[in-house]
Design a protein with these regions (language model features):
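Short, well-ordered alpha-helical microsegments
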Residues: 203, 448-449
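Catalytic core segments in nucleotide and nucleic-acid processing enzymes
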Residues: 458, 462
Length: 467
């Protein structure tokens, strides 16, 4: 049992012991069907906190020779498959998190990755193998000795691609990946490859290290969509179990429409259930900085589209021009596509339209607006709670003043006196209202029912009905 070579099942055991656990073990059925096939290389690119690393820990526990996971899987959905034990703990597993190496070894990261794995190989195989040979040859030698194939798992595989501007380093890294996944030796020793990242695979000229991977993204993930994020039925069951209001949960954390499935942010839902409180659990400076980076880019129509989405609207996005690289953003569509992959926008692939998925993400946008050219918008949003209070108190004069302020602020970036702009103004004027009220855009004619404060924070979903 090692850290990188044949790891334990500690990660999956911890997940199973957590306060909130949702069974995603049927993902392993999908992977088992791809062992030793042309489809054995899987690339999963999803936003952070959507269960990529949890899945990697589960894959460790299932395939690794370094542990016995019989009891961990015996009461799971996977166990309903009669031969689910066929591949359990039968493979040599290598598991790497590239981001942890990047933090410590930027200058010689590839050398260090190999050193750390080779150290564990040496403990296991001692003088049986010539460890001075190329890394893929060493893997082949281990396979020759043991007759046990490898399952290779790489978390944050794209960390170097996203963070390095050194083309030579990127080239060497891709050569290293080629040795793992496309060399002649890998045709024998590799049973399965599972790599995760934030962005889809970047097409780099003259590089073919990863062109044999099957990609699953925030745009399209069939047939494994349901395994990354919580499905609506799973969230309903959690709400019953933890006595939490489903509609509020939906408004706060739903909105990711992937392959027609409504997917929820699993980390935030779990936190809300455990803490019995609806709040933004995506509060960190990196998320605010990421949003701010893209919404302040100087591309025609970008500010209008952001404003429309902040007000609950949807905008058309051409995702095909995005080069899967944050450093080559060249248009409004590229900027919005980047936000989709980062999880800050939802996307309807049928209609090819994007939207702010839920109230949690809306609050992250609110924080991101505090600097730069959006500061005037941020100042207007800061008056939303006051407007809400004055509306409740029936202070018509102050309400009129605040609505006028909102009108002057928001119509400066929208079509003045356009009907949709006026609707946008009212929505933005009451931007923080969803934290306290059910939001109903239009009441049916003659319906005199009032919208009331709900102490349980029961909210309507932000996802546009036309999405």
């Amino acid at each position: 049992m090692g850290i990188y070579f044949n790891p334990s099942n500690a990660s999956f055991r911890q997940a199973r012991n957590s306060m909130v656990y949702v069974d995603k073990t049927n993902l392993l059925n999908f992977l088992n069907r791809r062992l030793f096939t042309d489809d054995k290389c899987i690339a999963l690119s999803h936003a952070r906190r959507f269960g990529k690393s949890h899945a990697a820990g589960m894959i460790d526990a299932y395939y690794s020779l370094g542990c016995d996971s019989t009891k961990l899987f015996e009461d799971t959905k996977l166990a309903s498959n009669a031969d689910y034990k066929k591949h359990m703990n039968k493979y040599n597993v290598i598991h790497l998190d590239i981001s942890s190496f990047w933090d410590d070894f930027k200058d010689n990261i590839i050398k260090k990755i190999q050193e750390y794995i080779l150290d564990e190989f040496k403990k296991e195989f001692k003088n049986k193998i010539d460890f001075t040979k190329k890394f893929n040859v060493v893997l082949m030698s281990i396979y020759d000795i043991t007759n046990i194939p490898f399952v290779i798992i790489i978390d944050e595989w794209d960390c170097i691609i996203r963070n390095s501007h050194d083309e030579n380093l990127i080239h060497k890294y891709l050569q290293f990946l080629h040795s793992l996944f496309k060399s002649e030796e890998s045709k024998s020793f590799l049973a399965l490859a599972y790599i995760t990242g934030i962005l889809p695979i970047k097409k780099i000229k003259d590089e073919s290290a990863l062109n044999n991977f099957r990609e699953y993204t925030m745009l399209k993930s069939k047939p494994i969509t349901e395994y990354y994020g919580f499905t609506e039925d799973e969230v309903k069951n959690l709400c019953k179990q933890y006595d939490m209001d489903f509609d509020s949960t939906k408004a706060w954390y739903n909105g990711y429409l992937i392959d027609g499935m409504h997917m929820y942010n699993p980390n935030s839902v779990s936190m809300a259930m455990d803490r019995q409180d609806f709040d933004s659990y995506w509060k960190n400076t990196s998320s605010f900085a990421s949003i701010n980076t893209f919404i302040t880019m100087n591309y025609a129509g970008l500010k209008d589209d952001i404003m429309a989405m902040l007000a609950g609207g949807i905008v058309r996005v051409n995702t095909n021009t995005f080069k899967n690289d944050f450093s080559t953003i060249a248009s409004k569509d590229d900027a919005l596509t980047a936000l989709i992959h980062l999880g800050y926008l939802g996307y309807d692939s049928d209609r090819k339209k994007a939207f702010i998925p839920n109230y949690e993400v809306a609050t992250a946008f609110e924080a991101a607006l505090q600097t730069g050219e959006w500061s005037d918008i941020a100042r207007a949003i800061s008056t939303c709670d006051e407007l809400l209070d004055e509306t409740i108190e029936g202070n018509a004069e102050r309400v009129s003043e605040l609505i006028e302020l909102a009108h002057d602020t928001y119509t400066s970036v929208l079509k003045y006196n356009d009907e949709n702009s006026l609707s946008c103004v009212l929505t933005m004027a009451y931007f923080t209202a969803p934290a306290y009220y059910n939001i109903i855009r239009e009441m049916p004619a003659g319906d005199r029912k009032s919208t009331r404060l709900n102490s349980s924070h029961r909210l309507e979903s932000r996802m546009p009905s036309s999405a």
